[in-house]
Amino acid sequence: MSKVVFLSNVDRRFAMMQVALQQLQQENLLSNDSVCAKLSDNTVWNDEWQKLLEDADILLLKWMGAGLDTPFFKKLLPFIKKHQLRYYIDAAGTEEEELVSGIEKNDLEKLKAYALYSGMKNYRNLFLYANGILTGKTDIELPDPMYWSAIYHPKAKTVYTDLAAYSTAETA
């Protein structure tokens, strides 16, 4: 199994990902080396972060709010590039939006969908899929577009998860 590291400054996402990780580790579906850690605007880059990430296989990071110009990110980004760590940094709402390295487009789309649709099932599968990118076992259940992540219309024949599909659909 691989070492998957998830970092976030989003309280709810961090809490749910922490539970998902603990469940998967208890079920021996994910390495006990995998980690979920909380960040803040004031997080300081230090030796502990270096130790955590130097043997990581993949980094998933959800960042909201301030840009990626914090002192922490100014140290993190060169570190992960130097160590050729695979990563996906979702920094929606910042100038950068997202940063990706070492993850193929198809795999990235699945990772994004698991995160977007949210819910414990999708968060568990996000970890499993990230692990699968490294082990070659990506036959994980597809992202489940939960109804709270969709567009509702009482006459719709399906659930729409994006405005383009909904606007071209016939709902009558």
Regions found by a protein language model. Give the residues of each.
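An N-terminal assembly and electron-transfer interface module characteristic of large anaerobic redox
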Residues: 1-172
